[in-house]
Amino acid sequence: MSVLHVCMVTRNKSIAATSLHTAMNLHMLCMMRGMHLEIHFVEDKSSLPKLIKSGERMFWMDYGTNLNNEILGKVVDPFDKGVQALVFPSVKEGINWDQFTKKTKAGSKEPVGQRGLEFDTTVGKKLADGLYELDKTSARVWAMDGKPVDKKLRGGKDPIKLPLDSNEAMFTTLKNIGIKVGVASEAIVVCHYTHECFGNILEAAGVELAP
């Protein structure tokens, strides 16, 4: 029986409710396909090398992310066109106001709510409908087949250490060693960005706020 390893990044030992929904939907897909599902709650990528050595499919979800149900089949099914890792692009945090102004002045027909958004992934040539070759990414949601990656990392004279601190550096390394990385352009990734409220800090126990 094949195994799907789902890695979910936690904050303060918790995950977002929408991430949980994605995990539950993946569980149903695995049951339908006769796959074994293992969920790992992680704080970083320190456990990733061990999972790669298992040779099984991995699915990574950063904290506060989820993936639309229509695309979840790509997480569990064999990748198309020889792809060995699949990226699900998402919007970066914040708004690029310079980009928004430039597009607006140029008369862009793009929806107003999207003109200032930047994505974490750029693509190359089209491989198939909804599938593109990766150019560059810092994706927070992705899937990978462990067996070909492990073979490339350990196949040379000197084993290659995969950089884990940066998503961009990790995928750049994967491309450089010959891993074919695809981009699922039809994926909808919703990201929840957390911010510390300054007011909550000031109203902590023992702190008195003057009127």
Task: Pin down the residues of each PLM region.
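Glycine-rich, basic loop-to-helix element that forms the pyrophosphate-binding segment
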Residues: 40-54, 70
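Residue-level marker for beta-strand->alpha-helix junctions and adjacent short loops that shape enzyme
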Residues: 9-13, 65-66, 93
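Short amphipathic alpha-helical segments and helix-helix/interface helices
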Residues: 48-49, 72-76, 168-172
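Short, high-confidence coil segments that cap the C-terminus of an alpha-helix
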Residues: 55-56, 83, 179
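Conserved catalytic core of nucleotide-sugar-dependent glycosyltransferases
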Residues: 68-158
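C-terminal catalytic/acceptor-binding lobe
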Residues: 2-5, 11-14, 131, 136-211
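Short beta-strand-to-loop acidic/aromatic patch adjacent to the donor-nucleotide binding site
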Residues: 55-68
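N-proximal low-complexity "stem/linker" segments adjacent to membrane-targeting elements
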Residues: 1-46
